[in-house]
Every structure is written in structure tokens, then in C-alpha cells.
Amino acid sequence: MLTINIEGAQVLMAFLNRTSKGNLPAESEMQTVLAANRFFMDFYSRWKGVTRESLIETMCRFNQPEYQPESPILSALAKGFRRAVIENERMQANLEFLRCVNPPIIVGGVLAYLPAHTPLQSVIHITIDGFNGGFQYQGQMGWSLLGDIISTEQFEAGISHELHHVGFAYWVERDPIRQSLLNEKSGREVAVRHVQNLLSEGMAMFYCSPDMVREEKVPEAYAHKLKSYRQDERLLFTRSEKLLALALKPDADFATCQQSLEALSIDFDGILPIGHYLGARMIESMSKHHPQKRIIECVQSLSCFLPLYNQSARKSGAFVYDPSLVEQVSQIFKAKQICCS
């Protein structure tokens, strides 16, 4: 069952409108806002440089010129709150649209790109989010009211993208070897996270929201970033490969590797992370030389992803990852399997 929760956005929108006029919230009102937006608060309070207290401050001070938070995330959220107030009529129109959406229709299309027997039971929390257009967290989704709802199809594509992440995460959580690797606080953890991010975002982009990699189908700022990625594609793939090489060194520093991963997996402009683009290009290449079923199997067998991609890349003339690095990634899983058996 897939449902939509719009209460958080409704309550926060009313709060932002009142606050922008200089009306300080009563304690009871603040608690109502926080309770209705608990999912949003829990997601962001785990990010570096963001706390529950700083989120509350941003909600209350977003419209004050002197409020300049150091965190780029808080800065983006404040900008989003200001935009929501300015575009209040569009926000209300988006809410009205969302009241008429039938979420279960979306599920069938997403299941086609996930392993058999993937349960897709989730909640779509509508947010007012100037940093993330959409995100998946603990089996549920956030989707920003700030996005342009051009059509039902466009909205369904955005939700499908995040819902695919929910299904993907279901299998990650049931893979004890991968779970162990993802909690090592080591270079190996970063290597596995990087490969997993390329696969997860690549599948969601290519299969569920393909318009996100077409310049003519996206807003101007997004199209500009997409164009720059296309022009620098080989350099970006080289950065991805260098991250693997760095993370796979025996003496790899976890913090340094993590920072390099964030540079590829997060876009602080809130537009399009590099890893999303590279992953989509990888799945596109694989789709030309491998059956869809084989690509979907990588969700449960992550170690097969890079070898399978390299096979297709060699045939199509795309970027090929260093075979020795690809083999090292495979060996990580084999070594962990022996250790855990």
C-alpha cells in the first residue's frame, strides 16, 4: 500500500506564511508543526552540520536578512521556505493536485525494475524542501512541494524514482554481508557505498525517471548542469574511478574517502549529483548489451554490477573501470563472505 501524507506540508506552509509577517509562533503551534513534520526533521537532523535545534531556528528565522547559516543544507532549506511563501498560490495548487493523486497506480510500474517479491509499502511525506526534491529514508519517502507539477506523469516519475530506492533498500537491509561492509567505517565501506549508489541511482534514473537525463525535458538550470556533465563525462568517470582506488587502499582514511564520496553523491545546489548522472549512463550502456533481468539481479548481487557494466562498456566504447579495481571490489564481498561463514 502506498499513501500520501500532506499534513506536514499544510501545517508548515501555514506556519511559514504567518512567520514571514512577523508573527512569532506560540509554543503549542511550534510543537504542532514539529509533530506533523517529524519525518522531515528526523531525516535532516542526521546530516553533518544540522541539528533539530538548527532546523527549528531555520523555520523561525528563514525570512530574516541577517540569518546566514553556515550549513549549505540549512541555507538551501531557508531559501526554499522563502520561495514557498513567495509562491504561495502555486504551493496551494500543488497541494490541491496531490489530494487527487492515486498512489497505488505507481507501484506496478516500479516493481518491473526490482527483484521478484519486493514489497512496496510506503508513505510519501510531502515536504517543503529547498535542498532535496525527493529522498528515501527508513522505507518512506519525502517529496518537495516546491517541485513543478507539470502533469500527473511527471509527478509519478518523481515518486517512482524514490519508490525504487525504497524497494532497493529492502534488499540491502536483508543482505548481511553488505550490511556488515556498510558499517565498517573504513575505505571498503566507502567503496561499497559508491558502487551501490551508482547502481541504485542509475536504475532509478534510467528506468523510473528517464526525462531527468534529457536536456529538453528539464528546467533550464537542470539542463545546464546536465550539459556540463555530458561535456565532462570522461573526467567525471575518472573521478569515480579515483574514488574507488583511494577507498580500496589498505591504509585508506575513512573521513577522506567519505568526503570524496559526498562530492560525487551530493549536489549542494540541489539539482543533480554527479553519481546520479554517471549511474544512469552506466545502466543505459548495460541495457544495450544485457537483458533487463540480468541488470535487476545486481540489486541482490552488487559485486556483479561493475563486471557487467565493464562488459557492455567495452562493446559500446564507453568508459571502462580499471579491471584490477573491479576485481578488488568483488574480492571484498568474497572475503567478507568467508569471514562471516
Label each residue range with its predicted role:
Residues 158, 162-170, 202:
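Catalytic glutamate of the conserved HExxH
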Residues 110, 117-126, 217-222, 294-300:
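Surface-exposed patches in mature extracellular/periplasmic domains of secreted proteins
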Residues 144-159:
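Short pre-active-site segment immediately N-terminal to the catalytic Zn-binding motif
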Residues 13-96:
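N-terminal accessory alpha/beta regions
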Residues 1-36, 171-245, 315-320:
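Post-HExxH zinc-binding segment in Zn-dependent metallohydrolases
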Residues 125-143, 166-183:
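A short mid-domain helix/strand-loop element embedded in enzyme catalytic domains
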Residues 84-137, 152:
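Auxiliary, metal-adjacent structural segments of Zn-dependent hydrolase domains
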Residues 222-341:
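Pan-zinc metallopeptidase signature
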